[in-house]
Each structure stands twice: as structure tokens, then as C-alpha cells.
Amino acid sequence: MAVLSKEYGFVLLTGAASFVMVLHLAINVGKARKKYKVEYPVMYSTDPENGHMFNCIQRAHQNTLEVYPPFLFFLTVGGVYHPRIASGLGLAWIIGRVLYAYGYYTGDPSKRYRGAVGSLALFALMGTTVCSAFQHLGWIRPGLGYGSRSCHH
């Protein structure tokens, strides 16, 4: 049986918070469907007047769903050896995705880059996963400090 550290609870809470964020974006798409009269299962609007706004709201949610599986994988695995770092990066990703979505919601897709911190956080989370793999394989050892062959310097 594997034993996770008590601090892994932060990772679990971050994962739950990410679901709340994804649900929030989904609710926004549902509201936009009603407002712009886009019925299921149509994914994108062709309405020349309001289609662009609906499509921006839909794309913000869809793009988040596209990166959600890697986010959850990196959070879950990277958090095994680095629960606090992974949780902090996970929160940065969540905030970045909200900034991304609300930038997109303006109707100006270039404003989605306000959420670039989320992409940086995702790459850093990938780093915690790689570091965890190296530690698990015994290629480096956990810990801080110079000369310890750790991920932290």
C-alpha cells in the first residue's frame, strides 16, 4: 500500500477547485447558448451578428477542456513528491484559466493572453512530474540544498 503525505490533501483540494472553475465556464456557455439562441448539439454559431461572442465564450471553455487532462495528470503525479509546489502551480493554472476565459469573453481573442500565467504554471507542473519520476526512479534524491542532486536548485 502506498502512503501519501498529509500535504497531498492540498493537491486534492486544488483538483476539486479546478473542477469548480471548469463548471463555472460550462455554466457560462449554457447562459450564452440561451442568450445567443445556440441550441444543442451545435458547437459554434454562424450568426453574423452575435455568433462571434458566443464562439469566444464556447472556445474559452473548449480550450480549457483540451488542457484539463494533462493538468490533472501533472497535478496528481507531480503532487506526490511536491504537494505544496504542485498545489501552488495548480492554483496559478486555475487563475490563469479564469483570466484567459474572461479575456476571451470580451470578444477580442487577443485578450485571452491575459491568462498566460496558466500556461507557464502548466509547464512548471510538468516539471514537478518529471522531477517526481526522477526521484521515484532514484536518479535524484528528494531534498533541498546544493550537492544533493535534487530538483530544487
Curated annotation (Swiss-Prot):
Record field: catalytic activity: leukotriene C4 = leukotriene A4 + glutathione; 15-deoxy-Delta(12,14)-prostaglandin J2 + glutathione = 15-deoxy-Delta(12,14)-prostaglandin J2-S-(R)-glutathione; (5S)-hydroperoxy-(6E,8Z,11Z,14Z)-eicosatetraenoate + 2 glutathione = (5S)-hydroxy-(6E,8Z,11Z,14Z)-eicosatetraenoate + glutathione disulfide + H2O
InterPro entries: MAPEG, MAPEG-like_dom_sf, Membr-assoc_MAPEG
EC number: 2.5.1.-, 1.11.1.-, 4.4.1.20
Membrane topology summary: Multi-pass membrane protein
Cytoplasmic side: 30-70, 141-153
Any one GO biological process: arachidonate metabolic process
Swiss-Prot/TrEMBL keywords: Lipid metabolism, Lipoprotein, Lyase, Membrane, Mitochondrion, Mitochondrion outer membrane, Oxidoreductase, Palmitate, Transferase, Transmembrane, Transmembrane helix
Lipidation (S-palmitoyl cysteine): C151
Family according to the record: Belongs to the MAPEG family.
Designated name of the protein: Glutathione S-transferase 3, mitochondrial
Organism: Mus musculus
